[in-house]
Amino acid sequence: MNLFEAVILGIVQGLTEFLPISSTAHLRIIPALAGWKDPGAAFTAIVQIGTLAAVLIYFFRDITAIVREVVAGILKGRPLGTTEAKMGWMIAAGTIPIVIFGLLFKNEIETSLRSLYWISGALIGLALLLTIAEKRMKNQLRQGVTMKSMENIGWKDALLIGLIQSIALIPGSSRSGVTITGGLFLNLSRETAARFSFLLSLPSVLAAGVFQLYKSWDLIISSPDNLIAIIVATIVSGIVGYASIAFLLNYLKSHTTSVFIIYRLLLGSGILLMLATGMLPAT
């Protein structure tokens, strides 16, 4: 991978990691269209550390408050004594399903599930689910139901969204896409669903990134070009990712996810068309 490819893929990762359109799908599709090699699941996981840094910086106050209250709660013998401590434990519990499924289906995630047929199917499938979630939310609001804020998220919400997050292991589904969809079904406001989605992503993205970095370390340092490319892509993804978080949270305050639904349907259909005409290889 040369420096130009690294910058482009870093921008793509940063733009698409937090928008509900799947970063993994775009990191798979764009190299295929450009005639580049598939960067692979390991590259995707490592570069996500850049977008992880974006979440840490953007939500610095929230995260420090959560960590501080979790530690204080343990020391005082009241682990669930505050809202922030409770949120920390809910995030931890919500991370368990994706860790289990990620380990169980590790080989499939890194190989067969990266087929463009799977990716296009996931893009279209989640778009349809998100459409249903939006329509349900519209009906709920019409009936006078108040959408939940961060303070109203309970254990049931956290565990169900955590379980739903496991679907994001399928390339093309989108981690933020599936968790936001799950949040809407559970009567979270769009902004709250996105905010909780980003916080919930921290443990699993960190674990996946560190694991792949450890696993691929010898290969990375064997070539200075590979090392520089990954560093550049990670830094770029972090900078662009920060802007993406700010944009999405502000956008969802007054807009639905319709634009992302339409984009997913068009992209998924376009990939299927290119596969059918031989313009793209499936693997």
Curated annotation (Swiss-Prot):
Q: Where are the transmembrane segments?
A: 40-60, 85-105, 113-133, 153-173, 193-213, 227-247, 259-279
Protein's GO biological process: cell wall organization; peptidoglycan biosynthetic process; regulation of cell shape; response to antibiotic
The broad enzyme category this protein falls into is hydrolase
Report how it sits in the membrane: Multi-pass membrane protein
Q: What is its main location?
A: membrane
Q: Which Pfam families match?
A: BacA
This enzyme catalyses: di-trans,octa-cis-undecaprenyl diphosphate + H2O = di-trans,octa-cis-undecaprenyl phosphate + phosphate + H(+)
Keyword annotations for this protein, in alphabetical order, are: Antibiotic resistance, Cell inner membrane, Cell membrane, Cell shape, Cell wall biogenesis/degradation, Hydrolase, Membrane, Peptidoglycan synthesis, Transmembrane, Transmembrane helix
EC number(s) given by UniProt: 3.6.1.27
Q: Where in the cell is it found?
A: Cell inner membrane
Family of this protein: Belongs to the UppP family.
The record's function comment reads:
Catalyzes the dephosphorylation of undecaprenyl diphosphate (UPP). Confers resistance to bacitracin.
Q: What else is known?
A: Bacitracin is thought to be involved in the inhibition of peptidoglycan synthesis by sequestering undecaprenyl diphosphate, thereby reducing the pool of lipid carrier available.
> What is the protein's name according to its record?
Undecaprenyl-diphosphatase
Q: Which organism is it from?
A: Chlorobium limicola (strain DSM 245 / NBRC 103803 / 6330)
Q: Which gene encodes it?
A: uppP
